[in-house]
Design a protein with these regions (language model features):
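Feature primarily recognizes SF3-like P-loop helicase cores of small DNA viruses
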Residues: 62-107, 134-456
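Modules that initiate DNA replication and primer synthesis
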Residues: 1-71, 105-141
Length: 456
């Protein structure tokens, strides 16, 4: 009664699977059965009930784990001796589909139903351990041999100890370790709020841990979603230049994937304020969700030589990111050309977080800088190699033209799905047409190159 929380149905189900089951359990007695009366009496006499740690869908979760433990035959399986090593292997085997240790991060990654996330502080892993401890008690009750059952109940009781859980969780780290590079490998999978979209094939499938995705977009995929106001907004900020608007749509759609073949960065440049680029960028970042990241301008700024032993968190945070936004760098910022070449050149990057190990990753991110001031460039090869692309925002919205609620409007779920469709359309156009620059983009980029050349 204690371990089942007074749930007579669960008590009956477990008792029938145990070695204590006898035929008299089903004997009719006093208008009921011997078993039902026994359970009722046990619940009535119970002074307290066990309160499981995992309350959500507890019965289903316990039943699923109980069945897994039975299939693994954990009490008699030589893989799981009744010690720290065996307990570590059991934890790793029980949760290998949803919990894996990442040595570079010195953390477990846990699947939350939509994506794999780092278990900061080990809290989610500890909850899994508590749930497994609860299931082991129920498993012990299914053992038919009385002596064996008693011994295994004593062993499973150890799992309720925090110190013991910490020990076997630590032992489990080495069983199925996974490298950072094994996550987010499919650069065309876009993990949406309601499933995963393959941007190459158009196929849409439910979330699954087997995809090994650590990011999720901020929008649900609805192929029928439309937002005429956003379409009109794009035309407005591009001053009615359809070719420039089409190119901008392709540049933003490019950010949906992890494909970096074009090896360039985009400057959304407007010398005047109130030109719409901030609203456009924030709306896109909202749709991108985890795939988008706001990056400090200092990340691309020239600076004194840094100690290679120092953490490179600005770069480490870009692992798995596809849309990196740098907003409004200061006037007079000097671009770190070597850093830009590294970040846009498809080379493997190495980075580390504070107090963690370093790791390598292939960049999937594209750089988008929205600014009123273009940074100083001294290395003209950034232009000759096509790494710098300027998309001009020439429109200035007067006060009477401004819509104060536009950002809120575009962040609504229905609008976010429509903007996602617009981005997908942009990526489709990019595949079909390539990145040929319209006159406005060519002229703006050439002007920037000319001004930079004079400064050299």
């Amino acid at each position: 009664a204690f371990w089942c929380g007074g749930d007579t149905e669960q008590m009956d189900r477990l008792f029938r699977k145990s070695g204590l089951m006898r035929s008299k359990w089903n004997r009719v007695q006093s208008g009921s059965t011997y078993g039902a009366l026994t359970l009722k009496k046990a619940v009535a006499q119970a002074m307290d009930f066990y309160r499981p740690y995992a309350r959500t869908s507890a019965e289903s979760d316990f039943d699923d784990m109980l069945q897994k433990l039975i299939e693994l035959n954990v009490s008699d399986n030589s893989r799981y001796p009744w010690n720290d090593n065996g307990s570590g292997r059991l934890f790793a085997d029980a949760y290998k589909d949803i919990a894996r240790y990442v040595p570079e991060r010195k953390k477990w990654y846990v699947y939350d139903g939509t994506r794999w996330i780092p278990d900061i502080g080990g809290l989610k892993t500890m909850e899994l351990a508590k749930s497994l401890a609860d299931s082991l008690v129920r498993y012990a009750l299914t053992i038919t041999d009385e002596r064996r059952r008693k011994d295994y109940l004593e062993y499973s009781a150890k799992w309720q100890s925090r110190n013991y859980r910490n020990t076997y969780i630590s032992d489990a780290q080495s069983v199925y370790p996974i490298a950072m590079s094994e996550f987010d490998c499919n650069i065309y999978y876009l993990n949406c709020q309601n499933g995963t979209l393959d941007l190459q094939t158009g196929e849409f499938h439910p979330h699954t841990p087997q995809d090994k995705l650590t990011k999720i977009a901020g929008a649900a995929y609805d192929p029928n979603a439309k937002n005429p106001r956003f379409t009109r907004f794009v035309a407005e900020v591009m001053s009615g230049d359809a070719d420039k608007a089409r190119f901008m749509q392709k540049s933003l759609g490019y950010g949906l994937t992890g494909d970096t073949r074009y090896e360039c960065m985009f400057f959304y440049y407007g010398a005047t304020t109130r030109n719409g680029k901030g609203t456009l960028m924030e709306s896109t970042l909202h749709v991108m969700g985890d795939y988008g990241l706001t990056v400090r301008p200092e990340t691309i700024a020239a600076k004194p030589s840094a100690n290679s032993q120092n953490p490179t968190e600005d770069i480490a945070r870009l692992a798995g990111v596809r849309f990196a936004n740098i907003s409004e760098p200061r006037r007079g910022l000097v671009l770190n050309e070597a850093q830009i070449k590294s970040m846009t050149g498809n080379d493997t990057l190495n980075a580390r977080f504070l107090h963690e190990n370093s790791f390598d990753f292939k960049p999937q991110f594209k750089l988008y800088v929205n600014t009123n001031y273009l940074p100083a460039i001294t290395d003209m090869t950034l232009f000759s190699s096509g790494r710098v692309v300027i998309i001009p925002f020439d429109r200035h919205f007067e006060e009477w033209e401004q819509e104060q609620n536009l950002k809120a409007e575009f962040s609504r779920p229905e609008a976010a799905s429509a903007i996602l469709n617009w981005l997908i359309e942009g990526y489709t156009l990019l595949q079909e047409e390539g990145f040929a620059q319209p006159k406005a983009v060519k002229d703006a980029t050439m002007s920037y190159q000319h001004d930079s050349d004079k400064m050299e």
